[in-house]
Amino acid sequence: MRAGSLAVACLADVPDAPILGRNTAGVLAALRTPDPGQLYKYHLGRLDWVDELVTSHGLRRATSAADLEAAHAAGQPSIVGDVEGLDFLEGKLERLEEAHSRGVRHVQFVHYTPNDIGDFQTGGITHQGLTSFGVEVIQACHRLGFVCDVAHATEDMTKQAVKVATKPLLLSHTALSGSPAMGPTPLTERQVSRDHARAIAETGGAIGIWHFFPSLDKYVDGLKEMVDVVGVDHVCVGTDQQVAPGSLQNYSQWVHLVAAMLRGGFSPEEAGKIAGGNYMRIFRAAVG
Protein backbone atom coordinates (compact mmCIF):
# COMPACT_ATOMS: atom_id res chain seq x y z
CA MET A 1 0.00 0.00 0.00
CA ARG A 2 2.79 2.42 0.84
CA ALA A 3 4.57 1.71 -2.44
CA GLY A 4 1.33 2.26 -4.35
CA SER A 5 0.51 5.52 -2.51
CA LEU A 6 -2.73 3.99 -1.24
CA ALA A 7 -4.21 5.61 1.84
CA VAL A 8 -7.05 3.15 2.38
CA ALA A 9 -8.05 -0.33 1.22
CA CYS A 10 -11.09 -2.43 2.08
CA LEU A 11 -9.80 -5.61 3.71
CA ALA A 12 -12.33 -8.34 3.03
CA ASP A 13 -13.34 -11.18 5.30
CA VAL A 14 -14.89 -13.83 3.02
CA PRO A 15 -17.07 -16.04 5.25
CA ASP A 16 -17.85 -18.66 2.59
CA ALA A 17 -14.18 -19.18 1.68
CA PRO A 18 -13.97 -22.61 3.42
CA ILE A 19 -16.52 -24.14 1.05
CA LEU A 20 -15.50 -22.42 -2.21
CA GLY A 21 -13.65 -24.09 -5.06
CA ARG A 22 -13.74 -24.69 -8.80
CA ASN A 23 -16.60 -26.87 -9.98
CA THR A 24 -16.41 -29.30 -12.91
CA ALA A 25 -16.82 -26.38 -15.32
CA GLY A 26 -13.88 -24.59 -13.71
CA VAL A 27 -16.14 -21.92 -12.23
CA LEU A 28 -15.74 -20.64 -8.66
CA ALA A 29 -18.70 -21.86 -6.60
CA ALA A 30 -19.77 -23.26 -3.25
CA LEU A 31 -18.91 -26.95 -3.48
CA ARG A 32 -21.10 -28.02 -0.57
CA THR A 33 -23.64 -26.73 1.90
CA PRO A 34 -21.93 -25.34 5.02
CA ASP A 35 -22.58 -26.93 8.39
CA PRO A 36 -24.66 -24.82 10.79
CA GLY A 37 -22.41 -22.25 12.43
CA GLN A 38 -19.40 -23.13 10.26
CA LEU A 39 -19.22 -19.86 8.35
CA TYR A 40 -19.95 -17.81 11.46
CA LYS A 41 -17.02 -19.47 13.25
CA TYR A 42 -14.76 -18.84 10.26
CA HIS A 43 -15.92 -15.20 10.10
CA LEU A 44 -15.00 -14.63 13.75
CA GLY A 45 -11.58 -16.13 13.14
CA ARG A 46 -10.99 -13.78 10.21
CA LEU A 47 -11.94 -10.79 12.36
CA ASP A 48 -9.32 -11.96 14.87
CA TRP A 49 -6.80 -12.17 12.01
CA VAL A 50 -7.60 -8.59 10.97
CA ASP A 51 -7.05 -7.43 14.55
CA GLU A 52 -3.62 -9.08 14.56
CA LEU A 53 -2.75 -7.62 11.16
CA VAL A 54 -3.64 -4.09 12.24
CA THR A 55 -1.50 -4.43 15.36
CA SER A 56 1.51 -6.15 13.80
CA HIS A 57 1.78 -3.88 10.73
CA GLY A 58 0.97 -0.56 12.36
CA LEU A 59 -2.12 -0.03 10.24
CA ARG A 60 -4.98 2.28 11.09
CA ARG A 61 -8.53 1.00 11.12
CA ALA A 62 -10.98 3.46 9.56
CA THR A 63 -14.38 3.35 11.24
CA SER A 64 -15.56 6.86 10.35
CA ALA A 65 -15.25 9.41 7.57
CA ALA A 66 -12.95 11.41 9.83
CA ASP A 67 -10.64 8.39 10.03
CA LEU A 68 -10.49 8.19 6.22
CA GLU A 69 -9.67 11.87 5.95
CA ALA A 70 -6.95 11.56 8.59
CA ALA A 71 -5.43 8.55 6.83
CA HIS A 72 -5.27 10.43 3.55
CA ALA A 73 -3.77 13.52 5.17
CA ALA A 74 -1.14 11.51 7.06
CA GLY A 75 -0.30 9.15 4.22
CA GLN A 76 -0.51 6.24 6.64
CA PRO A 77 -2.10 3.08 5.24
CA SER A 78 -5.48 2.29 6.75
CA ILE A 79 -8.04 -0.43 6.25
CA VAL A 80 -11.81 -0.48 6.15
CA GLY A 81 -13.16 -3.68 7.66
CA ASP A 82 -15.21 -5.41 4.95
CA VAL A 83 -17.27 -8.62 4.84
CA GLU A 84 -17.82 -10.18 1.41
CA GLY A 85 -21.05 -12.11 1.83
CA LEU A 86 -23.32 -12.10 4.89
CA ASP A 87 -23.66 -15.88 4.86
CA PHE A 88 -22.58 -15.98 8.50
CA LEU A 89 -25.74 -14.23 9.72
CA GLU A 90 -27.90 -17.36 9.49
CA GLY A 91 -31.00 -15.25 10.13
CA LYS A 92 -29.53 -13.48 13.17
CA LEU A 93 -29.42 -9.69 12.84
CA GLU A 94 -27.54 -9.37 16.13
CA ARG A 95 -24.49 -10.73 14.33
CA LEU A 96 -24.46 -7.51 12.28
CA GLU A 97 -24.20 -5.54 15.51
CA GLU A 98 -21.33 -7.78 16.60
CA ALA A 99 -19.50 -7.20 13.30
CA HIS A 100 -19.95 -3.45 13.70
CA SER A 101 -18.53 -3.59 17.22
CA ARG A 102 -15.49 -5.42 15.79
CA GLY A 103 -14.77 -2.57 13.37
CA VAL A 104 -16.52 -3.74 10.18
CA ARG A 105 -17.99 -0.85 8.20
CA HIS A 106 -18.54 -2.29 4.70
CA VAL A 107 -20.76 -5.31 4.00
CA GLN A 108 -21.59 -7.17 0.80
CA PHE A 109 -24.86 -9.06 1.02
CA VAL A 110 -24.20 -12.08 -1.22
CA HIS A 111 -21.19 -13.89 -2.67
CA TYR A 112 -21.03 -17.44 -4.08
CA THR A 113 -23.09 -19.29 -1.49
CA PRO A 114 -26.90 -19.33 -1.33
CA ASN A 115 -28.14 -17.42 1.71
CA ASP A 116 -31.37 -16.03 3.11
CA ILE A 117 -30.81 -12.45 1.90
CA GLY A 118 -31.14 -12.69 -1.87
CA ASP A 119 -30.01 -14.15 -5.19
CA PHE A 120 -26.49 -13.91 -6.59
CA GLN A 121 -25.41 -13.60 -10.22
CA THR A 122 -23.60 -16.92 -10.59
CA GLY A 123 -26.16 -19.06 -8.76
CA GLY A 124 -29.66 -20.33 -9.33
CA ILE A 125 -32.67 -18.08 -8.76
CA THR A 126 -34.32 -19.17 -5.51
CA HIS A 127 -35.70 -15.94 -4.02
CA GLN A 128 -36.71 -13.92 -7.10
CA GLY A 129 -34.47 -11.15 -5.82
CA LEU A 130 -34.35 -9.72 -2.30
CA THR A 131 -35.98 -11.60 0.59
CA SER A 132 -37.97 -10.13 3.47
CA PHE A 133 -34.99 -10.88 5.70
CA GLY A 134 -32.83 -9.05 3.16
CA VAL A 135 -35.03 -5.98 3.62
CA GLU A 136 -34.43 -6.19 7.38
CA VAL A 137 -30.70 -6.52 6.79
CA ILE A 138 -30.57 -3.37 4.66
CA GLN A 139 -32.55 -1.43 7.25
CA ALA A 140 -30.27 -2.66 10.03
CA CYS A 141 -27.16 -1.76 8.02
CA HIS A 142 -28.46 1.77 7.55
CA ARG A 143 -29.22 2.06 11.27
CA LEU A 144 -25.85 0.72 12.41
CA GLY A 145 -23.75 2.52 9.81
CA PHE A 146 -22.42 0.18 7.12
CA VAL A 147 -21.63 0.79 3.47
CA CYS A 148 -24.14 -1.49 1.70
CA ASP A 149 -22.53 -3.35 -1.20
CA VAL A 150 -24.67 -5.15 -3.79
CA ALA A 151 -21.77 -6.70 -5.72
CA HIS A 152 -22.61 -10.25 -6.90
CA ALA A 153 -26.35 -9.57 -6.46
CA THR A 154 -28.66 -10.24 -9.39
CA GLU A 155 -30.20 -7.31 -11.22
CA ASP A 156 -33.59 -8.11 -9.68
CA MET A 157 -32.16 -8.19 -6.16
CA THR A 158 -30.31 -4.94 -6.78
CA LYS A 159 -33.37 -3.13 -8.08
CA GLN A 160 -35.41 -4.34 -5.11
CA ALA A 161 -32.65 -3.20 -2.74
CA VAL A 162 -32.74 0.22 -4.40
CA LYS A 163 -36.41 0.55 -3.46
CA VAL A 164 -35.60 -0.20 0.18
CA ALA A 165 -32.39 1.81 0.51
CA THR A 166 -32.43 5.26 2.07
CA LYS A 167 -28.68 5.77 1.67
CA PRO A 168 -26.35 5.40 -1.33
CA LEU A 169 -25.60 1.84 -2.42
CA LEU A 170 -22.28 0.58 -3.73
CA LEU A 171 -21.62 -2.12 -6.31
CA SER A 172 -17.95 -2.57 -5.57
CA HIS A 173 -16.45 -4.71 -8.35
CA THR A 174 -17.77 -5.37 -11.83
CA ALA A 175 -17.64 -4.01 -15.39
CA LEU A 176 -20.17 -2.98 -18.01
CA SER A 177 -21.85 -5.90 -19.76
CA GLY A 178 -20.28 -6.53 -23.16
CA SER A 179 -17.39 -4.18 -22.38
CA PRO A 180 -15.31 -3.72 -25.56
CA ALA A 181 -12.35 -2.68 -23.41
CA MET A 182 -12.46 -5.91 -21.40
CA GLY A 183 -13.08 -8.11 -24.42
CA PRO A 184 -13.86 -11.84 -24.16
CA THR A 185 -13.93 -12.87 -20.50
CA PRO A 186 -15.06 -15.76 -18.30
CA LEU A 187 -16.55 -13.11 -16.02
CA THR A 188 -19.59 -12.31 -18.19
CA GLU A 189 -22.06 -13.31 -15.48
CA ARG A 190 -20.46 -10.82 -13.11
CA GLN A 191 -20.82 -7.87 -15.47
CA VAL A 192 -23.82 -5.54 -15.17
CA SER A 193 -26.24 -4.08 -17.69
CA ARG A 194 -26.77 -0.37 -18.20
CA ASP A 195 -30.08 -0.51 -16.34
CA HIS A 196 -28.44 -2.39 -13.47
CA ALA A 197 -25.79 0.33 -13.19
CA ARG A 198 -28.28 3.17 -13.47
CA ALA A 199 -30.30 1.72 -10.59
CA ILE A 200 -27.26 2.06 -8.32
CA ALA A 201 -26.61 5.61 -9.51
CA GLU A 202 -30.20 6.57 -8.68
CA THR A 203 -29.42 6.04 -4.98
CA GLY A 204 -26.47 8.42 -5.20
CA GLY A 205 -24.17 5.42 -5.12
CA ALA A 206 -21.39 4.18 -7.37
CA ILE A 207 -20.22 1.23 -9.44
CA GLY A 208 -16.67 0.02 -8.86
CA ILE A 209 -14.87 -1.16 -11.99
CA TRP A 210 -12.40 -3.92 -11.31
CA HIS A 211 -9.14 -3.97 -13.23
CA PHE A 212 -9.56 -7.36 -14.95
CA PHE A 213 -8.55 -5.78 -18.28
CA PRO A 214 -5.76 -6.60 -20.75
CA SER A 215 -3.78 -3.44 -19.91
CA LEU A 216 -3.88 -0.35 -17.73
CA ASP A 217 -5.01 1.80 -20.66
CA LYS A 218 -7.83 -0.67 -21.37
CA TYR A 219 -8.80 -0.44 -17.70
CA VAL A 220 -9.11 3.33 -18.09
CA ASP A 221 -11.29 2.68 -21.15
CA GLY A 222 -13.45 0.42 -18.96
CA LEU A 223 -13.87 3.26 -16.46
CA LYS A 224 -14.89 5.54 -19.32
CA GLU A 225 -17.49 3.04 -20.52
CA MET A 226 -19.25 3.18 -17.16
CA VAL A 227 -18.88 6.97 -16.87
CA ASP A 228 -20.66 7.28 -20.21
CA VAL A 229 -23.60 5.35 -18.72
CA VAL A 230 -23.97 6.81 -15.21
CA GLY A 231 -21.71 9.87 -15.03
CA VAL A 232 -18.40 10.47 -13.28
CA ASP A 233 -20.02 10.95 -9.86
CA HIS A 234 -21.12 7.32 -9.86
CA VAL A 235 -17.97 5.39 -10.83
CA CYS A 236 -15.07 4.27 -8.66
CA VAL A 237 -12.26 1.74 -8.67
CA GLY A 238 -12.99 -1.73 -7.33
CA THR A 239 -10.04 -4.02 -7.08
CA ASP A 240 -10.86 -7.54 -5.90
CA GLN A 241 -7.06 -7.52 -5.89
CA GLN A 242 -6.19 -11.03 -4.76
CA VAL A 243 -8.79 -12.72 -6.98
CA ALA A 244 -8.45 -10.61 -10.13
CA PRO A 245 -4.98 -9.07 -10.41
CA GLY A 246 -5.62 -8.13 -14.04
CA SER A 247 -3.89 -5.02 -15.32
CA LEU A 248 -2.47 -4.11 -11.89
CA GLN A 249 -0.69 -7.08 -10.35
CA ASN A 250 -0.52 -5.81 -6.77
CA TYR A 251 -1.20 -2.72 -4.69
CA SER A 252 2.24 -1.24 -5.36
CA GLN A 253 1.24 -0.69 -9.02
CA TRP A 254 -1.83 1.41 -8.22
CA VAL A 255 0.39 4.48 -8.10
CA HIS A 256 0.24 4.42 -11.92
CA LEU A 257 -3.56 4.60 -12.18
CA VAL A 258 -4.14 8.34 -11.81
CA ALA A 259 -1.48 9.15 -14.41
CA ALA A 260 -3.16 6.68 -16.77
CA MET A 261 -6.55 8.32 -16.19
CA LEU A 262 -5.12 11.76 -16.92
CA ARG A 263 -3.41 10.40 -20.01
CA GLY A 264 -6.72 8.87 -21.06
CA GLY A 265 -8.60 12.17 -20.95
CA PHE A 266 -9.97 12.45 -17.41
CA SER A 267 -9.50 15.80 -15.68
CA PRO A 268 -7.71 15.89 -12.29
CA GLU A 269 -11.08 16.46 -10.58
CA GLU A 270 -12.66 13.49 -12.38
CA ALA A 271 -9.69 11.24 -11.62
CA GLY A 272 -9.92 12.22 -7.95
CA LYS A 273 -13.58 11.27 -7.78
CA ILE A 274 -13.01 7.86 -9.37
CA ALA A 275 -9.83 7.08 -7.42
CA GLY A 276 -11.42 7.67 -4.02
CA GLY A 277 -13.66 10.71 -3.79
CA ASN A 278 -16.87 8.94 -4.74
CA TYR A 279 -16.26 6.11 -2.27
CA MET A 280 -15.50 8.70 0.40
CA ARG A 281 -18.83 10.41 -0.27
CA ILE A 282 -20.73 7.12 0.00
CA PHE A 283 -18.83 6.13 3.15
CA ARG A 284 -19.62 9.45 4.80
CA ALA A 285 -23.32 9.14 3.96
CA ALA A 286 -23.56 5.53 5.12
CA VAL A 287 -21.19 5.42 8.09
CA GLY A 288 -20.81 9.01 9.26
Give the location of each predicted region.
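Loop-centered beta-sheet repeat module
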Residues: 126-161
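N-terminal hydrophobic targeting/anchoring segments and the immediately downstream early-domain regions
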Residues: 1-125, 177-181, 186-288
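Short hydrophobic/aromatic-enriched beta-strand-loop microsegments
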Residues: 168-174
